[in-house]
């Protein structure tokens, strides 16, 4: 009995290829997916509904006293930043093995890691979908640049932690400029794109980003309110090289106690209290306060140099500094 070879035309037939859905079928599948929107967004919406200070939105409003962009574009930028900020928190909490966020269980402990990662990634693209409303294709370029910057900074931070490598202060500042500064810069660059004012606030925003992060690092180890919201000394449990920890380790390289505690990822309160005393003994908390004061002075100097091009700048920068938890200095 003879057998015939397969017909190559049949094997290559378009019938065997996946065809795009058309007409009613496409609408049906779209409708089904739309019905899952709340489920897909659930980890994100849970985080969004937790009480927060909404600092970034308030800062955008404060800077708009100078940039005066139209209200509709201002709301678009606020939405973009809100989506990105909360998406990054979802990912941060997973990468840091966090347990609490704003005093309640983190999203991935409720919805699971896979669903939470998907919700965070979904939010990145919801934010990107807002960009055409700004009416300038350069918005996509800014968005991509700053998201790449944010992920570079996050990668540096994670590497130091996982490799138990204590960075220098200069490396820390570079990381913060990318990670924390990225979202601040994204907001201000999109605002400048939408404004007819000729002001460059990026240098100021870079300084504010560093102030914000050092303050956060300080409060993580010294604030009762922070303990309630995120747990006591969470940075120690994460093994994170925060600003006071970096200063303390580098102030006394022969003392390996603090670096050893970081490697343990301890949840023991007594061990963490001992670590805080080690940090205090090297004057590292005072160093934080001194560095913040120095950076606040630098921010004020940047405003001063802008001169008359930014009317009312002194009062506005006080409001911005106040928003990130610093009392305005008396002049």
UniProtKB/Swiss-Prot annotation:
Mg(2+) 1 binds at residues 92, 96. GO terms for molecular function: (2E,6E)-farnesyl diphosphate synthase activity; dimethylallyltranstransferase activity; geranylgeranyl diphosphate synthase activity; metal ion binding. Dimethylallyl diphosphate binds at residues 101, 179-180, 213, 220, 230, 240. Its EC number is 2.5.1.-, 2.5.1.1, 2.5.1.29, 2.5.1.10. It comes from the Eukaryota. Keywords: Magnesium, Metal-binding, Transferase. One of its GO terms (biological process) is terpenoid biosynthetic process. Binds 3 Mg(2+) ions per subunit. The keyword Magnesium applies. Pathway: Secondary metabolite biosynthesis; terpenoid biosynthesis. CDD domains: Trans_IPPS_HT. It catalyses: isopentenyl diphosphate + dimethylallyl diphosphate = (2E)-geranyl diphosphate + diphosphate; isopentenyl diphosphate + (2E)-geranyl diphosphate = (2E,6E)-farnesyl diphosphate + diphosphate; isopentenyl diphosphate + (2E,6E)-farnesyl diphosphate = (2E,6E,10E)-geranylgeranyl diphosphate + diphosphate. Its cofactor is Mg(2+). Coiled coil: none annotated. The keyword Metal-binding applies. Mg(2+) 3 binds at residue 216. Mg(2+) 2 binds at residues 92, 96. Pfam families: polyprenyl_synt. Belongs to the FPP/GGPP synthase family. Geranylgeranyl pyrophosphate synthase; part of the gene cluster that mediates the biosynthesis of the diterpenoid pyrones subglutinols A and B. The first step of the pathway is the synthesis of the alpha-pyrone moiety by the polyketide synthase dpmaA via condensation of one acetyl-CoA starter unit with 3 malonyl-CoA units and 2 methylations. The alpha-pyrone is then combined with geranylgeranyl pyrophosphate (GGPP) formed by the GGPP synthase dpmaD through the action of the prenyltransferase dpmaC to yield a linear alpha-pyrone diterpenoid. This is Geranylgeranyl pyrophosphate synthase dpmaD.
